[in-house]
Amino acid sequence: MKKIKYLVLLLAMTIFASSCSSGGADSTGTSNTENKNYKIGISQFAQHGSLDNCREGFIKGLAESGIVEGENLTVDYQNAEAATANANTIAQNFVGNKVDLIAAIATPSAMSAFNAALDTEIPLVYTAITDPVAAQLATEDGKSTGNVTGTSDILPVEEQLKLMREMLPEAKTIGILYTTSEANSVSMIKLYEELAPKYDFTLVTEGVSATADIPLAADSILEKVDVLTNLTDNTVVSSLPLILDKANAKNIPVFGSEIEQVKIGCLAAKGIDYDQLGVQTGKMAAKILKGEAKASEIPFEAIESPLTYVNAAAGANLGIEIPQTVLDQATESFDTIESK
């Protein structure tokens, strides 16, 4: 009988010790994520090179942090096809499916996801957002406005103006096509308006509300300018091949905002590496998924050093000789124009 009582007591003590050990791990706020499978939703606003690079970089950043698609990560990727209504539906579906995290690529998708997840515990990580403050995703001091964080692709506007002036010393008028409903584009227009006179440029802008407006808007603005420069405007960038064709027909150079635009025929750009921006964002998302930080605790980040890209073939087609000083500072220079 004593032996039986002893065994019962020993079993009870073992169970109690095991329970205490488990509770101790939870109380420290740490957890074993090695065996956890994550489910995330990626909402990309439009299909074009810079956003595609951002998405691919995001997946790489997660993988470098030990969260690998096909192993411990399931990705539900959706493209809004440059339609805000689609972005809203995608975000609502992600919330309904109770994903572990929403990744939003470009401002309209981020704003849709933020609103959809507002009353949930689902964190939002955004990327390719030019102005998180204007999009109400961050405060002026960089802090989050909710369970949200991410990275900004704010354009180096002054550096772009310097590059344009160096390459086109006789140019007087810059044109910008932009989507009136994209907060990121509106913010950049204001910055161009402020800085263009400093480099002896006059600015002409033409707003569109949808992709269908772009052919006529491009025809209109090309009658008024010496050069076009692109923003990270999703609707406009999606139609860049059309814009380039129209500009080339009038022998008007087009400056891009990142590498993919220069590859397909823009003359040059001061911009960022969207693949690297995506990697940076993926690593932020991994910290949140692993419980190492909350989205609300991480200020948004940006890549500070712009890169220089030039396309010598585009210059030759336009009869523009690229200064050696520009070639010397170029991160990459292209001798061909990729098919669009």
Where are these regions (language model features)?
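C-terminal motif of bacterial Sec signal peptides marking the signal peptidase cleavage site
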Residues: 15-19
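Bacterial signal peptide processing site
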Residues: 21-23
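Extracytoplasmic "Venus flytrap"
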Residues: 39-65, 76-85, 181-185, 235
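An alpha-beta-alpha
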Residues: 40, 58, 149-196, 299-314
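Beta-alpha junction/loop-to-helix N-cap segments that form part of ligand/metal-binding clefts
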Residues: 79-139, 233-248, 252
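Flexible loop/hinge segments that line or gate small-molecule binding clefts
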Residues: 112, 117-157, 257-268
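Hydrophobic alpha-helical segments within soluble ligand-binding/sensing domains
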Residues: 131-173, 272-293
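Hinge/cleft segment of the Venus flytrap/periplasmic-binding protein
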Residues: 287-340
